[in-house]
Amino acid sequence: MSSVETLKAMAAAAAVALIQPGMVIGLGFGSTAAYATRMIGERLANGELREIVGVPCAEGTAALARELGIPLTTLDDVERVDITIDGADEVDPYMALIKGGGGALLREKMVAQASRRVAIIVDESKLSPALGTRFALPIEVVDFGYRATARWLAAQGGSVRLRLRSDGQPFRTDQGHLILDWACGPIADPTVLADRLAARAGIVEHGLFIGLATDLFVAGATGVRHIVRPDCGRIAP
Protein backbone atom coordinates (compact mmCIF):
# COMPACT_ATOMS: atom_id res chain seq x y z
CA MET A 1 0.00 0.00 0.00
CA SER A 2 1.40 3.41 -0.99
CA SER A 3 1.84 6.19 1.54
CA VAL A 4 -1.21 8.02 0.15
CA GLU A 5 -3.34 4.89 0.38
CA THR A 6 -2.12 4.35 3.93
CA LEU A 7 -3.25 7.87 4.84
CA LYS A 8 -6.65 7.27 3.28
CA ALA A 9 -7.05 4.10 5.33
CA MET A 10 -5.99 5.90 8.51
CA ALA A 11 -8.58 8.65 8.03
CA ALA A 12 -11.27 6.11 7.19
CA ALA A 13 -10.56 4.05 10.32
CA ALA A 14 -10.87 7.11 12.54
CA ALA A 15 -14.24 8.03 11.05
CA VAL A 16 -15.62 4.49 11.14
CA ALA A 17 -14.93 4.45 14.89
CA LEU A 18 -17.84 6.90 15.25
CA ILE A 19 -20.35 4.32 14.05
CA GLN A 20 -22.55 2.70 16.69
CA PRO A 21 -24.88 -0.31 16.44
CA GLY A 22 -28.31 0.53 15.06
CA MET A 23 -27.19 3.49 12.97
CA VAL A 24 -28.25 4.44 9.46
CA ILE A 25 -25.01 5.19 7.61
CA GLY A 26 -24.50 7.20 4.45
CA LEU A 27 -21.89 5.39 2.36
CA GLY A 28 -19.84 7.78 0.25
CA PHE A 29 -18.27 7.24 -3.15
CA GLY A 30 -14.65 7.30 -4.23
CA SER A 31 -11.36 5.63 -3.37
CA THR A 32 -11.15 7.08 0.15
CA ALA A 33 -14.78 6.40 1.03
CA ALA A 34 -14.34 2.83 -0.20
CA TYR A 35 -11.87 2.21 2.63
CA ALA A 36 -14.58 3.18 5.11
CA THR A 37 -17.16 0.95 3.42
CA ARG A 38 -14.79 -2.01 3.54
CA MET A 39 -14.03 -1.39 7.22
CA ILE A 40 -17.75 -1.24 8.00
CA GLY A 41 -18.17 -4.57 6.25
CA GLU A 42 -15.32 -6.06 8.26
CA ARG A 43 -16.80 -4.82 11.55
CA LEU A 44 -20.15 -6.32 10.62
CA ALA A 45 -18.55 -9.64 9.74
CA ASN A 46 -16.62 -9.91 13.01
CA GLY A 47 -19.57 -8.83 15.14
CA GLU A 48 -18.28 -5.41 16.21
CA LEU A 49 -21.27 -3.79 14.50
CA ARG A 50 -24.85 -4.97 14.28
CA GLU A 51 -28.25 -3.74 13.15
CA ILE A 52 -26.82 -1.06 10.88
CA VAL A 53 -28.06 -0.17 7.42
CA GLY A 54 -26.34 1.78 4.67
CA VAL A 55 -27.60 4.41 2.25
CA PRO A 56 -25.23 4.32 -0.75
CA CYS A 57 -24.37 7.54 -2.57
CA ALA A 58 -23.65 5.80 -5.89
CA GLU A 59 -24.33 2.58 -7.74
CA GLY A 60 -20.66 1.66 -7.39
CA THR A 61 -20.90 2.04 -3.63
CA ALA A 62 -24.05 -0.07 -3.54
CA ALA A 63 -22.29 -2.86 -5.44
CA LEU A 64 -19.33 -2.82 -3.05
CA ALA A 65 -21.59 -2.80 0.00
CA ARG A 66 -23.54 -5.79 -1.28
CA GLU A 67 -20.30 -7.72 -1.81
CA LEU A 68 -19.39 -6.98 1.81
CA GLY A 69 -22.78 -8.01 3.17
CA ILE A 70 -23.81 -4.54 4.33
CA PRO A 71 -27.62 -4.22 4.45
CA LEU A 72 -28.83 -1.36 2.27
CA THR A 73 -31.83 0.92 2.09
CA THR A 74 -32.74 4.07 0.19
CA LEU A 75 -33.03 7.69 1.19
CA ASP A 76 -36.79 7.44 0.65
CA ASP A 77 -37.12 4.68 3.23
CA VAL A 78 -35.38 6.28 6.22
CA GLU A 79 -36.38 9.27 8.32
CA ARG A 80 -32.78 10.32 8.87
CA VAL A 81 -29.20 9.28 8.26
CA ASP A 82 -27.19 9.20 11.47
CA ILE A 83 -23.79 9.70 9.89
CA THR A 84 -22.37 9.86 6.38
CA ILE A 85 -18.72 9.06 5.76
CA ASP A 86 -17.33 10.40 2.50
CA GLY A 87 -14.20 11.83 0.92
CA ALA A 88 -13.58 15.21 -0.69
CA ASP A 89 -11.50 16.57 -3.55
CA GLU A 90 -10.65 19.86 -1.83
CA VAL A 91 -11.28 21.32 1.63
CA ASP A 92 -10.94 24.98 2.55
CA PRO A 93 -10.19 26.46 6.00
CA TYR A 94 -13.92 26.77 6.74
CA MET A 95 -14.63 23.09 5.98
CA ALA A 96 -16.37 23.93 2.73
CA LEU A 97 -15.71 21.26 0.12
CA ILE A 98 -15.40 20.53 -3.55
CA LYS A 99 -16.76 17.08 -4.32
CA GLY A 100 -17.75 15.25 -7.46
CA GLY A 101 -14.48 13.94 -8.80
CA GLY A 102 -16.15 10.55 -9.06
CA GLY A 103 -19.31 12.02 -10.57
CA ALA A 104 -21.69 11.21 -7.70
CA LEU A 105 -22.14 14.79 -6.46
CA LEU A 106 -25.94 14.91 -6.70
CA ARG A 107 -26.60 11.81 -4.62
CA GLU A 108 -23.72 12.62 -2.28
CA LYS A 109 -25.21 16.03 -1.55
CA MET A 110 -28.71 14.65 -1.07
CA VAL A 111 -27.49 12.08 1.44
CA ALA A 112 -25.29 14.64 3.21
CA GLN A 113 -28.21 17.05 3.55
CA ALA A 114 -30.28 14.27 5.12
CA SER A 115 -27.54 13.41 7.64
CA ARG A 116 -27.23 14.44 11.26
CA ARG A 117 -23.47 14.17 10.96
CA VAL A 118 -21.17 14.24 7.92
CA ALA A 119 -17.63 12.95 8.44
CA ILE A 120 -15.21 13.85 5.66
CA ILE A 121 -12.03 11.78 5.36
CA VAL A 122 -8.99 13.14 3.51
CA ASP A 123 -5.23 13.20 3.49
CA GLU A 124 -3.38 16.48 3.93
CA SER A 125 -2.99 17.01 0.18
CA LYS A 126 -6.70 17.85 -0.06
CA LEU A 127 -6.41 20.90 2.22
CA SER A 128 -6.44 24.18 0.32
CA PRO A 129 -6.38 27.91 1.13
CA ALA A 130 -9.37 28.42 -1.18
CA LEU A 131 -11.68 26.10 -3.09
CA GLY A 132 -10.85 25.95 -6.77
CA THR A 133 -7.13 26.40 -6.17
CA ARG A 134 -6.24 22.75 -6.74
CA PHE A 135 -9.32 21.10 -8.20
CA ALA A 136 -11.76 21.95 -10.97
CA LEU A 137 -15.37 22.39 -9.88
CA PRO A 138 -17.65 19.62 -11.21
CA ILE A 139 -20.94 20.84 -12.65
CA GLU A 140 -23.64 18.26 -13.42
CA VAL A 141 -25.72 19.36 -16.41
CA VAL A 142 -28.49 18.12 -18.70
CA ASP A 143 -27.67 17.31 -22.31
CA PHE A 144 -29.89 20.02 -23.73
CA GLY A 145 -27.83 23.17 -24.23
CA TYR A 146 -24.80 21.85 -22.38
CA ARG A 147 -22.47 23.73 -24.71
CA ALA A 148 -24.34 26.94 -23.92
CA THR A 149 -23.95 26.18 -20.23
CA ALA A 150 -20.24 25.58 -20.76
CA ARG A 151 -19.92 28.94 -22.54
CA TRP A 152 -21.71 30.67 -19.68
CA LEU A 153 -19.34 29.12 -17.16
CA ALA A 154 -16.28 30.05 -19.22
CA ALA A 155 -17.54 33.62 -19.43
CA GLN A 156 -17.30 33.79 -15.63
CA GLY A 157 -13.57 33.03 -15.94
CA GLY A 158 -11.35 29.99 -16.27
CA SER A 159 -11.82 27.07 -18.62
CA VAL A 160 -14.43 24.33 -19.00
CA ARG A 161 -14.16 20.81 -20.35
CA LEU A 162 -16.67 18.04 -20.83
CA ARG A 163 -15.71 15.05 -18.70
CA LEU A 164 -14.93 12.00 -20.80
CA ARG A 165 -14.54 8.31 -20.05
CA SER A 166 -11.35 6.43 -20.83
CA ASP A 167 -12.82 5.39 -24.20
CA GLY A 168 -13.38 9.01 -25.18
CA GLN A 169 -17.15 8.94 -24.76
CA PRO A 170 -18.90 11.45 -22.49
CA PHE A 171 -18.97 10.46 -18.83
CA ARG A 172 -22.49 9.89 -17.51
CA THR A 173 -23.62 10.16 -13.90
CA ASP A 174 -25.86 7.55 -12.32
CA GLN A 175 -28.74 9.85 -13.33
CA GLY A 176 -27.56 9.92 -16.95
CA HIS A 177 -26.33 13.51 -16.87
CA LEU A 178 -23.10 15.05 -18.17
CA ILE A 179 -20.32 16.59 -16.10
CA LEU A 180 -18.56 19.84 -16.96
CA ASP A 181 -15.30 20.33 -15.08
CA TRP A 182 -14.84 24.06 -14.57
CA ALA A 183 -11.29 25.19 -13.75
CA CYS A 184 -12.48 28.45 -12.27
CA GLY A 185 -9.48 29.24 -10.08
CA PRO A 186 -9.66 30.24 -6.41
CA ILE A 187 -13.24 30.96 -5.36
CA ALA A 188 -13.51 34.16 -3.33
CA ASP A 189 -16.98 33.43 -1.92
CA PRO A 190 -18.21 29.85 -2.36
CA THR A 191 -21.68 30.68 -1.00
CA VAL A 192 -22.27 33.42 -3.56
CA LEU A 193 -21.05 31.18 -6.38
CA ALA A 194 -23.19 28.28 -5.18
CA ASP A 195 -26.28 30.49 -5.31
CA ARG A 196 -25.45 31.66 -8.84
CA LEU A 197 -24.93 28.12 -10.08
CA ALA A 198 -28.13 26.88 -8.43
CA ALA A 199 -30.10 29.61 -10.20
CA ARG A 200 -28.81 28.72 -13.68
CA ALA A 201 -31.21 26.58 -15.74
CA GLY A 202 -29.52 23.50 -17.16
CA ILE A 203 -27.31 22.99 -14.13
CA VAL A 204 -28.58 20.00 -12.17
CA GLU A 205 -26.07 20.26 -9.30
CA HIS A 206 -22.63 21.62 -8.52
CA GLY A 207 -19.75 20.27 -6.46
CA LEU A 208 -19.70 22.97 -3.77
CA PHE A 209 -20.62 21.45 -0.40
CA ILE A 210 -21.01 24.31 2.05
CA GLY A 211 -22.00 23.95 5.69
CA LEU A 212 -22.50 20.20 5.39
CA ALA A 213 -19.32 18.70 6.86
CA THR A 214 -19.55 18.39 10.65
CA ASP A 215 -16.38 16.37 11.17
CA LEU A 216 -13.12 16.38 9.23
CA PHE A 217 -10.54 13.61 9.57
CA VAL A 218 -7.19 14.64 8.10
CA ALA A 219 -4.47 12.00 7.87
CA GLY A 220 -0.84 13.07 7.72
CA ALA A 221 2.65 12.04 8.73
CA THR A 222 1.92 12.65 12.43
CA GLY A 223 -1.39 10.79 12.50
CA VAL A 224 -5.04 11.72 12.08
CA ARG A 225 -6.53 15.03 13.17
CA HIS A 226 -10.24 15.08 14.01
CA ILE A 227 -11.61 18.57 13.46
CA VAL A 228 -15.17 19.43 14.43
CA ARG A 229 -16.74 22.29 12.52
CA PRO A 230 -16.96 25.42 14.65
CA ASP A 231 -20.08 27.56 14.60
CA CYS A 232 -18.10 30.21 12.77
CA GLY A 233 -14.55 31.04 11.78
CA ARG A 234 -11.69 29.09 10.35
CA ILE A 235 -10.63 25.62 11.40
CA ALA A 236 -7.39 25.44 13.30
CA PRO A 237 -4.34 24.96 11.04
Swiss-Prot record:
Name the pathway it acts in. Carbohydrate degradation; pentose phosphate pathway; D-ribose 5-phosphate from D-ribulose 5-phosphate (non-oxidative stage): step 1/1
Binding residue positions for substrate: F29, G30, S31, T32, D86, G87, A88, D89, K99, G100, G101, G102, K126
SUPFAM superfamilies in the cross-refs: D-ribose-5-phosphate isomerase (RpiA), lid domain (SSF75445), NagB/RpiA/CoA transferase-like (SSF100950)
Gene3D superfamilies listed in its UniProt record: 3.30.70.260, 3.40.50.1360
Under Pfam families, the record lists:
Rib_5-P_isom_A
Task: Name the residues annotated as catalytic in the UniProt entry.
Answer: E108
For this UniProt record, the keywords arranged alphabetically read as follows: Isomerase
Tell me the enzyme class: isomerase
Q: Name the EC number(s).
A: 5.3.1.6
Q: Name one GO biological process term.
A: pentose-phosphate shunt, non-oxidative branch
Q: Does the keyword Lipid biosynthesis apply?
A: no
Note the CDD domains from the entry: RPI_A (cd01398)
Gene Ontology terms, MF aspect: ribose-5-phosphate isomerase activity
- The yes or no answer to whether the keyword Amino-acid biosynthesis is present is no
**What is this enzyme's catalytic activity, as reactions?**
aldehydo-D-ribose 5-phosphate = D-ribulose 5-phosphate
Which NCBIfam families does the entry link to?
Answer: PRK00702.1 (NF001924), rpiA (TIGR00021)
Per the record, the similarity remark reads: Belongs to the ribose 5-phosphate isomerase family.
Q: Describe the task this protein carries out.
A: Catalyzes the reversible conversion of ribose-5-phosphate to ribulose 5-phosphate.
Subunit field text: Homodimer.
Q: What is this protein called?
A: Ribose-5-phosphate isomerase A
